[in-house]
Amino acid sequence: MSSGWSQNDHRSYSNPPPVSGKRPRNDSGNKVTVVLGAQWGDEGKGKVVDLLATESDIVGRCQGGNNAGHTVVVEEKEYDFHLLPSGIINTKCTSFIGNGVVIHLPGLFEEIDKNEKKGLKGWEKRLVISDRAHIVFDFHQAVDGLQETQRQAQEGKNIGTTKKGIGPTYACKASRTGLRICDLMADFNEFSTRVKNLVQQYQSMYPTLKVDVESELKKLKEYAERIRPLVRDGVYFMYDAIHGPQKKILVEGANAALLDIDFGTYPFVTSSNCTVGGVCTGLGIPPANIGDVYGVSKAYTTRVGIGAFPTEQLNAVGELLQTRGHEVGVTTGRKRRCGWLDLVILKYAHMINGFTAIALTKLDILDVLDEIKVGVAYKINGKRIPHFPANLEVLQKVEVEYETFPGWKSDTSAARKWGDLPAKAQNYIRFVENHIGVPIKWVGVGKSRECMIQMF
């Protein structure tokens, strides 16, 4: 057989046959179901994920780090997750930490140890970590604190970061000085040199920064061997999951729409895209494989830290919501600010994410109120504005236009189906649904999995 080149070969490559007609969009493969926060975080995403994870084969995280907090209650045991996908509880499910997540390895193992004591078993057989995920170092956390102190000194205010090193790690990623899990898995001497160079860069910017590099490298060498069996090429892992046998794949978003680096109340936001685009970039999957996108919202609104909050109630109502709702941050332990449900932000979150349905949580917290208000529009100088303001100073000046509803004044915590809810609570839910133009699929009336009323 001749392996030489011929004129025929040339013709076949330079004049390929035309592709007939328009190429169809490749919609093949399993669809990925996505759960996202629709407010400022702490909406109860973990509970919705937990419900769906019972039937899922894979649950993934696509962005954020251990600055997020999910609480899941199973058989009266309360599990707290920060980096681990909450699907890790399900023994038949693989949990995947994607390339868009930033991983603090000491934090990851501390979280695993805590949840093991509560009964989590066999996690190492069902956890996969992307080799392209970036590493959060202890010195990133120290820098996070120094930056907050600097902001406070210069501007008289800070961002209210969790000081978990998330922002500095994403900044390193963008400036191309970051290190990834694949670097830790490769030559450790080369990895060590790059870590030392990064520390020197930071110390030139922050002369007071003290770092015990050798101690951190020693710990990282130990962690490297512990995670080595869990590390995979995330792109190929997700491709096989989507294009292999039929699987149910679920993605749990961290943080929320109004904390998104692009679409949130900047600069009081997180450092990643926590809207639907972050799912594609944080896992390495095509948009065509995104299926249902579920938005999660409380029946009222909360926010941790500083930043604009148009429907905030700095009064007895806000205090009652805070107390009844046990509104304390899972990650920070800070009290959450509380206010009425804001449909302007919910509609805005839907515009970005294209929610196919909503989960409305913590309806039972409103049970004791005589009247309940819902923010339906913003006004500036008495005139309605047709959009959610990007500029923070404008947002802080808006007046909120409210619709007022009579309270139902009865306990909803035992409700397990739509018909069990009082008529006034049903009216409230239908109003929210109609205003934002998205069906409400679940209504939460308590902490446990059983307290989620499924509507359809």
Curated annotation (Swiss-Prot):
Transmembrane segments: none annotated. Binds 1 Mg(2+) ion per subunit. It is found in: Cytoplasm. Coiled coil: none annotated. InterPro entries: Adenylosuccin_syn_GTP-bd, Adenylosuccin_syn_Lys_AS, Adenylosuccinate_synth_dom1, Adenylosuccinate_synth_dom2, Adenylosuccinate_synth_dom3, Adenylosuccinate_synthetase, AdSS_1_vert, P-loop_NTPase. Residues 1-30 are annotated as: Disordered. Its EC number is 6.3.4.4. The modification Phosphoserine is found at S130. It catalyses: IMP + L-aspartate + GTP = N(6)-(1,2-dicarboxyethyl)-AMP + GDP + phosphate + 2 H(+). IMP binds at D42, E43, G44, K45, N67, A68, G69, H70, T162, R176, N255, T270, R334. Keywords: Cytoplasm, GTP-binding, Ligase, Magnesium, Metal-binding, Nucleotide-binding, Phosphoprotein, Purine biosynthesis. GO terms for biological process: 'de novo' AMP biosynthetic process; IMP metabolic process; muscle cell cellular homeostasis; skeletal muscle fiber development. Disruption phenotype: Morpholino knockdown of the protein in embryos results in severe disruption of muscle fibers. The keyword Cytoplasm applies. GO terms for molecular function: adenylosuccinate synthase activity; GTP binding; magnesium ion binding. Component of the purine nucleotide cycle (PNC), which interconverts IMP and AMP to regulate the nucleotide levels in various tissues, and which contributes to glycolysis and ammoniagenesis. Catalyzes the first committed step in the biosynthesis of AMP from IMP. Belongs to the adenylosuccinate synthetase family. PANTHER family: ADENYLOSUCCINATE SYNTHETASE (PTHR11846), ADENYLOSUCCINATE SYNTHETASE ISOZYME 1 (PTHR11846:SF2). HAMAP family: Adenylosucc_synth (MF_00011), Adenylosucc_synth_vert_basic (MF_03126). This is Adenylosuccinate synthetase isozyme 1. The lineage of its organism: Eukaryota, Metazoa, Chordata, Craniata, Vertebrata. The gene is adss1.
